[in-house]
Amino acid sequence: MLLEFTKMHGLGNDFMVVDLISQRAYLDTATIQRLADRHFGVGFDQLLIVEPPDVPEADFKYRIFNADGSEVEQCGNGVRCFARFVHERHLTNKTNITVQTKAGIVKPELGQNGWVRVNMGYPKFLPNEIPFVADEPEALYTLELANDQNISIDVVNMGNPHAVTIVPDVLTADVAGIGPQVELHKRFPERVNAGFMQVIDDKHVRLRVFERGVGETLACGTGACAAAVSGMRRGLLANSVEVELAGGKLQIEWQEGDVVWMTGPTTHVYDGRLDLRYFQG
């Protein structure tokens, strides 16, 4: 069967977006892995699925699958692309939409020239909300790694779990070595996204993220939210912060006790069609 899709990206964090309202398809783990292959498939960090909502207050249901086929709760760069996609495909004429995710409701607002502002919901910090194994809540936790190496982390759930550590320079940070150890650490029973943040000043940080089930990506929207909120909680950052990632910049806003707002661009790369039979086992 032929499957129509759109390739999009948010700051280089790239997606295959599929409308399963107007067409039908079954995409299992192995099929998603084959589609994600950058040599033999479409190639992407995440697959984004548009479905009818299960709850009356939502306009759409938004499902996210990593390149390894695992389904995750949230993707910040993805929800911006999702919002642009449903509007450009005329699935809605709204510019403010309500989207159901595994993590709850998010509310993207479409702006000009592909920019989207998203209400990302409330951050969570308690260990059981991440989830993270700890005897009691603390401002920072020490994580033991291989070769007697320890790092200090904050933990934040932005619809998906994040560990944030501050580094002197993101360019020299050992993301490839430390990232997988943090992602798969036994204290994170559902694995975790590992963020490495360099504070430039109180309104500007640089960030690299090793994403759960993907590896390091050019940008991570929920990771940017988690890092900014972590810095704000520590008193290091103002309430509105520019987060600089390899793929570009996001603006993150947060007030204690309120929702997190993320603003950033989207890019529509191309529309495609493929014969799904070649990717199914």
From Swiss-Prot:
A family per Pfam: DAP_epimerase
Its EC number(s): 5.1.1.7
Residues engaged in binding substrate: N13, Q46, N66, G76, N77, N160, N193, E211, R212, G221, T222
UniProt keywords, alphabetically: Amino-acid biosynthesis, Cytoplasm, Isomerase, Lysine biosynthesis
Reactions this protein catalyses: (2S,6S)-2,6-diaminopimelate = meso-2,6-diaminopimelate
Domain of life: Bacteria
The keyword Chloroplast belongs to this UniProt entry's keyword annotation: no
Location(s), subcellular: Cytoplasm
Site entry (Important for dimerization), positions: Y270
Cystine connections: none
One GO MF term: diaminopimelate epimerase activity
Chief location of this protein within or outside the cell: cytoplasm
Site (Could be important to modulate the pK values of the two catalytic cysteine residues) residue list: H162, E211
Active site: C75, C220
Pathways involved: Amino-acid biosynthesis; L-lysine biosynthesis via DAP pathway; DL-2,6-diaminopimelate from LL-2,6-diaminopimelate: step 1/1
PANTHER family found in the cross-reference section: DIAMINOPIMELATE EPIMERASE, DIAMINOPIMELATE EPIMERASE, CHLOROPLASTIC
Subunit-structure text: Homodimer.
Free-text function comment from the UniProt entry: Catalyzes the stereoinversion of LL-2,6-diaminopimelate (L,L-DAP) to meso-diaminopimelate (meso-DAP), a precursor of L-lysine and an essential component of the bacterial peptidoglycan.
Record's protein name: Diaminopimelate epimerase
Protein encoded by which gene: dapF
